[in-house]
Structures are given as C-alpha cells and as structure tokens.
Amino acid sequence: MLKLIDMMHIAIFTALMAVLGFMPPLFLSFTPVPITLQTLGVMLAGSILRPKSAFLSQLVFLLLVAFGAPLLPGGRGGFGVFFGPSAGFLIAYPLASWLISLAANRLRKVTVLRLFFTHIVFGIIFIYLLGIPVQAFIMHIDLSQAAFMSLAYVPGDLIKAAVSAFLAIKITQALSLSDTMFTKGG
C-alpha cells in the first residue's frame, strides 16, 4: 500500500509530465515523432522517486492521456496516440523511469556523471529499444530506417539526460527527502 507521501510524489511527477507536455513540440520533416521535453520528466522521476513511485507517476500520466487529457505536446491525447508512431516511446516511459530508479538506488555514490550514464542507458537506449520497433511497424518501414530517423533525437536526448542528472542531484539535495534515491530500498 502506498503512503500519502508516495501518492503526493506520484502526483507531482505526473503533473510535471503534464507541464512538459505543454511545451511546443518540434516536428522534423522526415518523421511524425516530435521532439519533446517529456523524457526529461521520465528521467527526473526515475532519479528522484522510489522505483514503484517512479513507475506509477508515468503510468498515471499515460492513463490520463489515454482517457483523453491533451497532455502530450501539441495538445494530443486520447487512446489513439497508443496506435501512432510514438506509441512504443510512450509505453516505455513507466518502465524506463522504474529502471532508472532501480539503477540509481544501486549506485554506491550518486554523482551527476553516474546518473547521466544511467539516463543514457535507461532513459534513452531503453526507450529507443521499445520505441523504434513500434514506430517501424506502425509506419510500415524497415527497422533500420526507423533507427536512422531516430538518430536526429540523440543530441537533444543527451542534453536532457545531462540536465536531468544535474537537476535530480540538486533537487534531492535541496529537499533532503528521506525517501529518495539516496535512501536504499523501496
């Protein structure tokens, strides 16, 4: 059973995802998957929350989207987004956040650099591993073509990984929360 504080953390990070969804998307001419800031929220939730809370914050966000809340960039929402080219990327959010949290909890010493590499592995590579095949399937293109198109996202995602690592450390230090990644367990 979740404690009240866990529910509050889940709500805060669900709201953060919604706020990041109001940032205008950047569409590229060669792919229907927009560049957004929401993976920053996935990485932050995973870096700051316990694994279960990190997962649930992203799941609640996706449920709100599925039920029609226009929380994705460009005001998108509704069940149909889970049948579009972004579906695999979206579905990866809860698992990526959970994996980031698990990995962060296992770090002996949490540093910006270690968290940055954790974000690369689980916040970028893992999300791509789920998102690219689904995108290829939905768009009826080769997997290699979808992977090549996704290379355009890598520089921005690396910046988001670095920013979220830095912010996670600073936020956690500022709040000195006892139930963050710095406390093992959960």
From Swiss-Prot:
Taxonomic source organism: Bacillus subtilis (strain 168)
GO molecular function: biotin transmembrane transporter activity
Function in brief: Probable biotin transporter.
GO cellular component, one term: plasma membrane
Superkingdom, taxonomy of origin: Bacteria
Family per similarity comment: Belongs to the BioY family.
Name of the featured protein: Probable biotin transporter BioY
Membrane topology: Multi-pass membrane protein
Keyword terms, alphabetized: Cell membrane, Membrane, Transmembrane, Transmembrane helix, Transport
